[in-house]
């Protein structure tokens, strides 16, 4: 889930259904205020949940705490959860809220995909370095997961993200 605008990067880029209007987006981080569910197939079997991005949002600490409770309750109730995508700004990865979600994945043995967004803001070597650091962290924590660089503006990483999501959704 997002700390870096999941709505714009995943849903409106729409890597699975190719529907450009799947989610409304905002230029301001933290506009997602509730859990939004998007059905991505005709059989109504596969869904993506867009969770409030409390790690990067300009909201009060109280609101951040409320979102953290909402997200934790939601994730704990999802029997059919196939994996968790955490989108982070590659220049500011692993905020406290990111680490909380990563710990949750570790505790629940949930597959994890870390999308290091805005990779167009770094050099290729900088992107590789950040992706390697994230993958090393996942390995040290014995997590089922991987990290990848991503840029919605340059379309970098779209194929890898699409491939991973399709595997999770068995499509």
Regions picked out by a protein language model, each given a short descriptive name:
Residues 13-14:
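Post-Walker A alpha-helix
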Residues 35-39, 45, 69-77:
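Conserved alpha-helical scaffold flanking the Walker A/P-loop in AAA+ ATPase domains
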Residues 121-171:
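Canonical P-loop GTPase G-domain recognition
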Residues 63-91, 103-115:
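Inter-motif core of Ras-like GTPase G domains
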Residues 50:
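Conserved active-site aspartate in kinases
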Residues 17-44:
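Switch I (effector-binding) loop of TRAFAC-class P-loop GTPase G-domains
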Residues 1-10:
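Single conserved hydrophobic/aromatic residue that forms the stacking wall/gate
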Residues 54-65, 120-123:
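Flexible beta-alpha connector loops of hexameric P-loop NTPases
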